[in-house]
C-alpha cells in the first residue's frame, strides 16, 4: 500500500521534535531553527514529482550539539551517513547494495540516490566545539517528471525500488542514529568509523576525525565536505 504524501506523520522517539515543510531546503530550515530549538530538531520534506515540479524528494535534516572540538565533532556527519545507509538497507531487499561515494553521495546498486551535507554554526573554528551542526540528506523519492524512459540512466528513486512508505526511512534513520551515538559513547569513535567504512564505495578506512585513509594517502573530511557537492545542484539531487 502506498502512503499519501499529504497525511503521513513520523513516529519518532525522544529527544526528536519534528517539523515538516512543504517546500524549500530542509537543511537550511534546520540551521535556522538550531540556535533556538537545539539538538534533536528534525526537519523533513516529502513531495511527489511531476513534469513541472521536478523529481519527488525525501529530505531530512537533524540538529546536533557536539561536545568535541570540530575535528572530532565531524564524526557526527559520519554517524549520520552510516545511519542513513542502515535505514535504507532495512527497507530494501538484502541483495541490494547501499554505498557511500566519498564523502557525501549515496549510491543504490551503483546508481545515484542522493547525498548528504554538513552545516556548521557560524564562526565554528577547528580548535573549538561548534555551537551546533546540522546533518542534512536529500533522496530522490520518485522520477515521475521524466518523460522519456532511460533519459537519466545514472540515477534511481525510492519509488522505482519499491519503497512504498519513504518516510519510514527517516524513522529508521532516527533510531539508527541514536544507536550509533550510543555505540560511540560506549565503544569509542572506531565503532562509528567502521559503520561508515563498511559502506564505502572502493573501500578504505575512516580515522578518528572522519578522514578517509586509502593506500594512496589520506583525505581530510573537513575540506572534502567544504567543496561543492557533485551529487546535487542548487535545486537538489541530480538525476
Question: For the regions a protein language model found, what residue spans apply to each?
Answer:
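N-terminal lobe of the biotin/lipoate ligase/transferase fold
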Residues: 1-93, 195, 221-239
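Histidine (H) residue identity feature
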Residues: 19, 91, 145, 154, ...
Amino acid at each position: 500500500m502506498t502512503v499519501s504524501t499529504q497525511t503521513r506523520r513520523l513516529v519518532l522517539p525522544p529527544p526528536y521534535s519534528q517539523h515538516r515543510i512543504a517546500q524549500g531546503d530542509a537543511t537550511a530550515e534546520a540551521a535556522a531553527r538550531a540556535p533556538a530549538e537545539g539538538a534533536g530538531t528534525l526537519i523533513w520534506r516529502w513531495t511527489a514529482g511531476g513534469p513541472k515540479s521536478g523529481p519527488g524528494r525525501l529530505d531530512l535534516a537533524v540538529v546536533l550539539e557536539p561536545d568535541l572540538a570540530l575535528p572530532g565533532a565531524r564524526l557526527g556527519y559520519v554517524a549520520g551517513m552510516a545511519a542513513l545507509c542502515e535505514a535504507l538497507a532495512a527497507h530494501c531487499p538484502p541483495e541490494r547494495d547501499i554505498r557511500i561515494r566519498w564523502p557525501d553521495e549515496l549510491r543504490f546498486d551503483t546508481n545515484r540516490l542522493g547525498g548528504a551535507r554538513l552545516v556548521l554554526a557560524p564562526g565554528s573554528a577547528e580548535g573549538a566545539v561548534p555551537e551546533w551542526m546540522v546533518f542534512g540528506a536529500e533522496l530522490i523519492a520518485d522520477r515521475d517528471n521524466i518523460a522519456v524512459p532511460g533519459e537519466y540512466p545514472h540515477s534511481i528513486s525510492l519509488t522505482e525500488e519499491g519503497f512504498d512508505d519513504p518516510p519510514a526511512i527517516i524513522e529508521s534513520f532516527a533510531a539508527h542514529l541514536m544507536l550509533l551515538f550510543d555505540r560511540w559513547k560506549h565503544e569509542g569513535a572506531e565503532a562509528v568509523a567502521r559503520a561508515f567504512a563498511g559502506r564505502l564505495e572502493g573501500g578504505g578506512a575512516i580515522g578518528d576525525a572522519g578522514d578517509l585513509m586509502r593506500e594512496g594517502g589520506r583525505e581530510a573530511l573537513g575540506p572534502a565536505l567544504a567543496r561543492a557537492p557533485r551529487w546535487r545542484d542548487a535545486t537538489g539531487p541530480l538525476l
